[in-house]
Regions:
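Ferredoxin-type iron-sulfur electron-transfer modules and their immediate structural context
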Residues: 1-52, 56-59, 63-66, 316-317
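Transmembrane alpha-helical segments of multi-pass membrane transport proteins and ion-pumping complexes
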Residues: 14, 18-23, 52, 98, ...
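Iron-sulfur-associated redox domains of electron-transfer enzymes in respiratory
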Residues: 106-317
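Conserved Radical SAM active-site core
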Residues: 39-40, 45, 55, 64-124, ...
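A short local structural element in Rossmann-fold oxidoreductases
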Residues: 25, 70, 100, 196, ...
């Protein structure tokens, strides 16, 4: 990455007035025969030179990861190396997408998972409802493909979503009866991190209900305490959430990692027989992956749907 955020372009005329040199309080700018130059070792990226230039020859050069972070968790150290502050990071994953060099990546547990399988332990995959939109193959065939990777069982997290719906509905009704002005859902780990780290005043309005991943993992562990639970998740946030529940959620893999496993093992999803869906899962449980899915599920099961008036936050911005 660039060491400083401001550069002099070829629009510079090496003018006589040289306002940029006077604006810089660190003496970082020198003017040659054709244009000015900024010394990256002296520059503190204050931007005063850019503001002073009448030709707009000095521009701001953004660092993609820093610019993409919505909470200012990424910055350079004294050596110019980027670092992510875990006290600020909400694990939204925007920096990973923004970095053109692929320098930011998630911690992977794939080797750990296969070690558990090799040791003969019952490794159970917990699949998020959004997986259905990630592959061209039928959703049931994708579930079969996951089983062929060596998992002892494949459980839909939509099962836990039903429990989340019931508990969140009851909590919402109780809060409204007590006079609360509103309540937010609690399933998105990045939202929860944002509240805890940057908006603590909002925490009183957030539902205390666990996410579907937690309830699904609890159910698996209750049936078989020896089971190793692996969440197949759509986002970086789920990995951070799993760290809060290490006793029931053992590992997390992303959809990208799942696709890599299919390719590495040469599993042709289209050629597989589709796995049957769990008949105990209500339709609204699979709708959690959609925008306002949690709220719509609560609304659909509420005694009086008109009590639920949703306000939707769509997207990371």
């Amino acid at each position: 990455c660039v060491k400083n955020k401001y550069i002099v372009t070829n629009l510079c005329r090496a003018c006589v007035a040289r306002p940029c040199t006077y604006a810089c309080k660190k003496g970082a700018i020198t003017v040659g025969e054709k244009q000015a130059h900024i010394d990256p070792e002296s520059c503190v990226s204050c931007g005063m030179c850019m503001d002073a230039c009448p030709f707009h020859a000095i521009i701001y050069q953004p660092v993609p990861c820093e610019e993409s972070c919505p909470v200012g968790a990424i910055s350079k150290d004294e050596h110019g190396v980027e670092h992510i502050d875990p006290e600020k990071c909400i694990y939204c994953g925007k920096c990973m997408v923004a970095c053109p060099f692929g320098a930011i990546f998630e911690k992977t547990f794939m080797i750990d998972i296969f070690r558990e399988m090799k040791a003969g332990k019952p490794v159970v995959a917990m699949v998020a409802p959004s997986l259905g939109g990630q592959f061209k193959a039928d959703y049931g065939k994708v579930l079969t493909g996951i089983k062929k990777l060596g998992f002892a069982d494949v459980v839909e997290v939509a099962l836990g979503a039903n429990i989340t719906t019931e508990k969140e509905r009851e909590e919402f009704i109780e809060r409204m009866e007590e006079g609360a002005s509103f309540m937010t859902t609690s399933c998105c780990p990045s939202w929860m991190n944002l509240v805890r780290k940057h908006m603590p005043e909002m925490e009183q309005y957030v539902s205390t209900t666990y996410s579907p991943m937690v309830y699904t993992a609890q159910g698996i562990k209750e049936k078989n305490p020896e089971a190793i639970t692996v969440m197949v998740a759509p986002c970086v946030g789920k990995r951070s959430e799993s760290y809060l529940y290490r006793d029931i959620v053992d590992y997390v893999i992303s959809y990208e990692e799942l696709e890599a496993l299919f390719k590495a093992t040469e599993i042709d999803l289209e050629s597989l027989e589709p796995m049957e869906f769990d008949p105990n899962i209500a339709g609204h449980g699979r709708g959690f992956a959609m925008i306002s899915g949690v709220t719509q599920s609560v609304k659909a099961t509420a005694p009086d749907p008109n009590v639920v008036k949703e306000v939707v936050i769509d997207g990371l911005n």
